[in-house]
C-alpha cells in the first residue's frame, strides 16, 4: 500500500476495526456490496473490496496470486491484523474472552490440485457466531460452530482471538 488513497483507506479501516462492530452499517447497499466475510471478521465496514483478501492489507499477497497452504493463510492473516494494529492469537471455541476481544474462525476450501481456492471467516462476539457472505446481510449462526460446518466442503483452519 503506497498511494495516498491507500493510506487513507487503511486509516479508515484501522479506525473502524478498533470499535465494536455496528451491524446496522450493513443495512446500506454500498457497505453490503463492497465488503465480505474477511472485512466482517476484522470489523471493517469501509468500502474497499480489493483489500479484503488475506494478505492484501499488509501488501504481502498480490490479488491474482493463489494461496499455497493453510500456514501461508495464517501468516498473512497475522500480518494483515498487525497492519491495522489488532492483536491476534490462537484460541478455541471454549476460551472466554474479554469485552475488548472477539474471535474469528478461518475456513478454507481445498480442491483436487491441493491449492486453496477460497476462504471463509466467521465472527464470535456477544456470545454468538455470525458470518457475512459477499453482498448479503450478516447472518447469525448460533452459540457454536460445531454443527454449522459438518456439511460444508470447508475445512476449519483455526479459531483466533482478536484484541482491539
Range-by-range predicted roles:
Residues 43, 107, 124, 161-162:
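Hydrophobic side chains in beta-strands
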Residues 3-86:
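Cysteine-nucleophile protease catalytic domains, especially the papain-like/related folds used
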Residues 46-50, 114, 138:
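An almost-null, non-specific background feature
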Residues 64-136:
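...with weaker cross-activation on analogous glycine-rich loops/strands in unrelated enzymes
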Residues 127-164:
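Active-site or metal-binding loop neighborhoods of secreted/extracellular toxin and effector enzymes
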Amino acid at each position: 500500500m503506497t498511494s495516498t488513497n491507500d493510506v487513507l483507506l487503511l486509516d479508515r479501516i484501522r479506525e473502524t476495526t478498533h470499535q465494536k462492530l455496528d451491524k446496522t452499517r450493513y443495512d446500506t447497499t454500498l457497505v453490503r456490496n463492497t465488503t465480505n466475510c474477511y472485512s466482517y471478521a476484522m470489523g471493517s465496514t469501509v468500502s474497499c473490496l480489493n483489500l479484503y483478501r488475506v494478505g492484501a492489507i499488509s501488501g504481502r499477497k498480490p490479488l491474482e496470486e493463489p494461496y499455497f497452504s493453510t500456514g501461508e493463510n495464517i501468516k498473512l492473516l497475522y500480518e494483515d491484523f498487525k497492519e491495522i494494529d489488532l492483536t491476534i492469537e490462537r484460541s478455541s471455541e471454549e476460551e472466554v474472552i474479554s469485552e475488548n476481544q472477539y474471535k474469528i474462525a478461518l475456513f478454507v476450501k481445498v480442491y483436487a490440485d491441493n491449492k486453496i481456492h477460497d476462504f471463509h471467516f466467521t465472527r464470535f462476539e456477544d456470545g454468538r457466531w455470525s458470518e457475512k457472505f459477499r453482498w448479503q446481510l450478516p447472518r447469525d449462526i448460533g452459540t457454536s460452530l460445531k454443527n454449522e460446518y459438518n456439511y460444508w466442503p470447508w475445512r476449519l483452519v483455526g479459531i483466533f482471538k482478536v484484541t482491539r
